């Protein structure tokens, strides 16, 4: 990914973390590990082992329950105070391990601690792999609204290892498919065709390989847009398709109803419906968008507790 502020690589593979040389990315001897406490112990140990192989002179960590409530200034402050107490320097590297909430939080902390230190993401959810970990947007929630506080902070690298997807529930996988659908709808008819024919059972032989291919295509679409418009002055706004409604839905539900990917699914249907009413698309195109979202077990209607007037 080549942007005005920095260039970095996205690495893909299946169960490659354990043998990946961290020094290929950073020579930092001070590494701070931020991870989701809900991750399986085996996975956490695997990543800690990967970090320790680089023989850092200083290593510490911060674990938290990755939910929208904890994606906050308060959690950021706790991490920053720990970094200060342990005297982590400007040459430090933060390694994030978890879903989009974790990458957003870690990226935000990295952007403000000592006016900016390196961060590397190891995203573990499909949504984080195809969207949240790529592009440099970081943020935390205010008391009432999502992602109101943030900064742009491009990572030093992103390691996308599909082995972590195997422990995801169908609901969390579906949340990630919503972002792949979004990328297909805004940019790539061939990806739309692949989604139409895709078998979602990743435990079926060969399907994880096909999913890896979808992830590569999807991240490339996002990376290409980010390269053109890092700070969202023009074409990067296309990546917000479905998100204007989605963030409102999540806020109205106080982050206790639909997860982000599900809200994006509903948001894309809402945006498509608005496009239909404005004459920008026809009814056949609207039906195709809605049916594709349904295929991936995503909701297509506003939840009962979401009044349109509040959204």
Name each region found by the language model.
Residues 197-308:
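Active-site segments that bind and position negatively charged phosphate/pyrophosphate groups
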Residues 101-108, 129, 248:
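Short glycine/serine/threonine-rich phosphate/pyrophosphate-binding segments
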Residues 66-67, 97-99, 241-242:
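Glycine-rich beta-strand-to-loop/alpha-helix junction loops that act as flexible
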Residues 1-93:
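ATP/NTP phosphate-donor binding region
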Residues 108-198:
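A glycine/threonine-rich phosphate-anchoring loop and its flanking beta-alpha core
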Residues 32, 60-62, 95, 120-122, ...:
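Hydrophobic/aromatic beta-strand patches that form the interior of the parallel beta-sheet core
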């Amino acid at each position: 990914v080549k942007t005005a502020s920095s260039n970095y690589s996205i690495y893909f593979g299946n169960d490659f973390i354990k043998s990946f040389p961290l020094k290929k990315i950073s020579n930092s001897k001070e590494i701070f590990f931020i991870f989701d406490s809900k991750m399986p112990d085996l996975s956490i140990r695997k990543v800690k082992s990967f970090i320790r192989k680089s023989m850092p002179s200083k290593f510490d960590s911060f674990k938290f329950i990755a939910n929208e409530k904890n994606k906050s200034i308060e959690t950021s402050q706790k991490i920053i105070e720990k970094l200060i107490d342990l005297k982590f320097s400007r040459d430090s590297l933060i390694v994030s391990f978890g879903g989009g909430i974790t990458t957003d939080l870690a990226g935000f902390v990295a952007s403000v601690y000592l006016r900016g230190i390196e961060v590397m993401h190891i995203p573990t959810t499909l949504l984080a792999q195809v969207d949240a970990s790529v592009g440099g947007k970081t943020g935390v929630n205010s008391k009432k609204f999502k992602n109101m506080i943030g900064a742009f902070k491009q990572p030093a690298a992103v390691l996308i290892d599909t082995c972590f997807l195997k422990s995801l529930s169908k609901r969390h996988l579906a949340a990630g498919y919503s972002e792949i659908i979004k990328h297909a709808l805004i940019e790539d008819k061939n990806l739309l065709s692949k989604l139409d024919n895709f078998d979602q059972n990743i435990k079926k032989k060969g399907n994880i390989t096909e999913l890896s291919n979808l992830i590569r295509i999807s991240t490339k679409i996002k990376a290409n847009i980010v390269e053109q418009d890092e700070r969202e002055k023009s074409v990067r706004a296309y990546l917000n398709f479905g998100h204007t409604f989605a963030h409102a839905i999540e806020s109205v539900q106080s982050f206790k109803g639909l997860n982000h990917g599900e809200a994006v699914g509903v948001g894309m249907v809402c945006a498509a419906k608005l496009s239909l009413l404005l004459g920008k698309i026809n009814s056949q195109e609207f039906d195709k968008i809605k049916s594709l979202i349904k295929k991936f077990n995503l909701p297509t209607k506003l939840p009962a507790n979401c009044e349109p007037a509040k959204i």
